[in-house]
UniProtKB/Swiss-Prot annotation:
Annotated binding of GTP, by residue: 20-27, 88-92, 142-145
SUPFAM superfamilies: EF-G C-terminal domain-like, P-loop containing nucleoside triphosphate hydrolases, Translation proteins
CDD domains for the chain: RF3, RF3_II, RF3_III
Protein name: Peptide chain release factor 3
Classification via Gene3D superfamilies: P-loop containing nucleotide triphosphate hydrolases, Peptide chain release factor 3, domain III
Protein family according to the UniProt entry: Belongs to the TRAFAC class translation factor GTPase superfamily. Classic translation factor GTPase family. PrfC subfamily.
Gene name of this polypeptide: prfC
Amino acid sequence: MSPSEYALEVAKRRTFAIISHPDAGKTTITEKVLLFGNAIQTAGTVKGRGSSHHAKSDWMEMEKQRGISITTSVMQFPYGGCLVNLLDTPGHEDFSEDTYRTLTAVDCCLMVIDAAKGVEDRTRKLMEVTRLRDTPILTFMNKLDRDIRDPMEVLDEVERELKIACSPITWPIGCGKLFKGVYHLYKDETYLYQTGKGHTIQEVRIVKGLNNPDLDVAVGEDLAKQFRQELELVQGASHEFDHDAFLSGDLTPVFFGTALGNFGVDHMLDGLVEWAPAPMPRQTDTREVVAAEEKFTGFVFKIQANMDPKHRDRVAFLRVVSGRFEKGMKLRQVRTKKDVVISDALTFMAGDRSHLEEAYAGDIIGLHNHGTIQIGDTFTQGEDMKFTGIPNFAPELFRRIRLRDPLKQKQLLKGLVQLSEEGAVQVFRPLTNNDLIVGAVGVLQFEVVSSRLKSEYNVEAVYESVNVSTARWVECDDVKKFEEFKRKNEVNLALDGGDNLSYIAPTMVNLNITQERYPEVRFRKTREH
């Protein structure tokens, strides 16, 4: 392949994730994005809890029951001359750690906001994570077919609370039962709303020009007059779109629509392929890697078990940072210093797998993993370096785990270590007893772990409360002082799933006192993989 052909392939890639508060419509919009990208023929109406139609992107058993995205799926589809990689992130508020890590693998994010509710808690947290890397953000104001808040008010709230300038690209005409469509500020066109449920994409009627009398006929004179006045205010008060400000994460283009009614999603996708960046450079511990480089590099940001119920396998999700992947390629796993031949990499369509012949910078590929790959692993064509910025977050909730059948201790430990390697939960083994303590960022993770232990490892476990309120990874350059610290605090020390030493504190007061007592010891809230 010539350098110009390779450059063309990379330039076509757009890799993004959707962030939102639970129930803002993220899973529905994921479905409709795939529908407009022709990736699925039927957008299964999401979350008819208990219905036989399940969203294509929610496919683990527990997700099917609850109607929430617990795992991170990857979907690739063509749109507008580009190849789009969509990383679906857990929408439920308990799954932040997995979601955080997924955000390290994308070049752009789509923020979905329920226009009736505005900025919600989960959105704030996820925006903080995107801020760590100044990720560009597009915004979709959803649920226009319901009664919503004043759109100007919601934009002000986004600007104030999320510290990002808003630039409306489309603007709604009416809402709820009076929702008539949206006007595109830069194309001077009105798209009239016709609801399209499920997998039908309606032919949209377009009225050209803001002062076209056809608009008055289509939406009614009163509404048309009111809309034109509103638009004057909007154009005077809002920011013009600035591509550089978007790329630096300082400004977000805003689109309006209703994902459930299949309306407005294509306008947002048009903006995404036109403005979102092609694969971006990434930092390693030795240098910056740019997508145009000829040699293959990539990093693992997620490991998922049980993607195929018939085979108890695990798949490592790898983001290609540079170069071209080809079937049968020999790659170096930097952490283990081993060369491996990758003959059966996968590409995904949420649970449907197909074997992959090639992939380029920006793509996500799946590697079969029999316990040898960990989150944060870097793969190269020989160069020794490690991609940085793929963190573990200190858990906030803890439980002691006990077996119903004491003879299954070995299976329990194996299951917990594997689940911790894929980031589903963190495991701590205290140095002074045989307890197993699991730590999570949200309550639902405990449920996921117990149901997976049962279905994948045939282990029935129960949780008990434990006197731990927080954990920190500890390290120290002074060997003598570290030994003294370990000797005097042994009762509060534990090893995590990767055998890293951790301090498990019964209270925040205890942690603060210990930190003051041992200033030379570093207590870390996050740990690089």
